[in-house]
């Protein structure tokens, strides 16, 4: 099997390492955008920037520059870039015969100056717009790159309307330390992956303000309800949100110390500005960029998402950390 992973960030590198470690004669190529990074990875045998101290498998090829030859020979192409770069890559890959999957979680940002009715698209909607004939899907679920790179047990979900894509993802990544489940509900899987990042900012805020475990549990539970409401309005299946890409990913991202989105909430609770919080991460926290587009989509569908709305007001500077909590607690009582 010939696998190409585009993007040598933490997640792209970790999955490429997982695939290359299988040792069954497969060819795994990791494409890095930055030439210096690619050379440093080859020289040191590790991705010192994103996964320091974790050795790359000898079978993993790290390349830079011309990629067309690798793409033409691929049996599976995985896009490991942030959401902001997905549209460009899908356009470039629109005519490849191999299945294509992405790893990013979120909604595409609404361009500056767009109309009030504009809303961000999910990745599969971007693909339908840019590359409608592409065999495409997503690999998602509760996972921190550092644990995958160290071959710690992980379960993921491959989601696509095309069985060939799910089959390729299972063949590429299912192994001793990783289980990959197939799901045809790509809408539900992508909604879960996008909304959980926003909710994790809220739980980070809660933890940073030392509001206690009761408050965190309430945010996770009510956040799951928000996620499900939006997903159902978009055509997802209810059961998807009780699976790996819904509840599973939400619990991990909302509670795990490796969560970038939770870290943003923690830093805001400490009095940092959003700019300071994002700069201190050194990595992309998709929830910061997805929150506004998630809320815009919900409003177009008349879906109530009070936690998401509060996070957006916090990120926009219209609420301070303590005010955000008061804002949620002051809502009128209602049935669960």
Swiss-Prot record:
Q: Name one GO cellular component term.
A: cytosol
Q: What is its EC number?
A: 1.1.1.94
Q: Which residues does NADPH bind? A: 11, 33, 105, 145, 260, 284, 286
List, alphabetically, the PROSITE patterns matched.
NAD_G3PDH
Give, as one word, the top-level EC class: oxidoreductase
Active site location: 196
State the family named in the UniProt similarity comment for this chain. Answer: Belongs to the NAD-dependent glycerol-3-phosphate dehydrogenase family.
User: Mind telling me which NCBIfam families this protein's record contains?
Assistant: PRK00094.1-2 (NF000940), PRK00094.1-4 (NF000942)
**PANTHER family from the entry?**
GLYCEROL-3-PHOSPHATE DEHYDROGENASE, GLYCEROL-3-PHOSPHATE DEHYDROGENASE [NAD(+)] 2, CHLOROPLASTIC
The record's function comment reads: Catalyzes the reduction of the glycolytic intermediate dihydroxyacetone phosphate (DHAP) to sn-glycerol 3-phosphate (G3P), the key precursor for phospholipid synthesis.
Its protein name is Glycerol-3-phosphate dehydrogenase [NAD(P)+]
State the organism of origin.
Answer: Delftia acidovorans (strain DSM 14801 / SPH-1)
């Amino acid at each position: 099997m010939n696998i190409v992973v585009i993007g040598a960030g933490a997640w792209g590198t970790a999955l490429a390492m997982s695939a290359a470690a299988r040792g069954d004669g497969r060819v795994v190529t990791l494409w890095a955008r930055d030439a210096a990074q690619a050379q440093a990875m080859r020289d040191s045998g590790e991705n010192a920037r994103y996964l320091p101290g974790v050795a790359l498998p000898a079978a993993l090829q790290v390349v830079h520059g011309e990629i067309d030859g690798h793409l033409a020979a691929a049996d599976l192409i995985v896009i490991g870039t942030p959401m902001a770069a997905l549209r460009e890559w899908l356009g470039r890959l629109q005519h490849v015969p191999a299945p294509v999957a992405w790893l990013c979680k979120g909604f595409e940002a609404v361009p500056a100056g767009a109309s009030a009715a504009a809303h961000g698209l999910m990745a599969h909607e971007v693909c339908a717009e840019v590359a409608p004939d592409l065999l495409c899907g997503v690999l998602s679920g509760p996972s921190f790159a550092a644990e995958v790179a160290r071959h710690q047990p992980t379960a993921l979900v491959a989601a696509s309307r095309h069985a060939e894509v799910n089959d390729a993802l299972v063949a590429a990544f299912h192994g001793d330390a990783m289980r990959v489940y197939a799901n045809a509900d790509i809408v539900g899987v992508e909604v879960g992956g996008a909304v959980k990042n926003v909710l994790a900012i809220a739980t980070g805020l809660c933890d940073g303000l030392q509001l206690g475990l009761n408050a965190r549990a309430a945010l996770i539970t009510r956040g799951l309800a928000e996620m499900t409401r939006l997903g159902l309005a978009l055509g997802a299946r209810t059961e998807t949100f009780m699976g790996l890409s819904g509840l599973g990913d939400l619990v991990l991202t909302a509670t795990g110390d490796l969560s970038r989105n939770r870290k943003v909430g923690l830093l805001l609770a400490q009095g940092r500005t959003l700019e300071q919080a994002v700069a201190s991460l050194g990595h992309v926290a998709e929830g910061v960029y997805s929150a506004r587009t998630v809320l815009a989509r919900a409003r177009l569908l008349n879906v109530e998402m009070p936690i998401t709305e509060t996070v957006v007001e916090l990120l926009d500077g219209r609420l301070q950390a303590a005010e955000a909590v008061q804002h949620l607690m002051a809502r009128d009582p209602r049935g669960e």
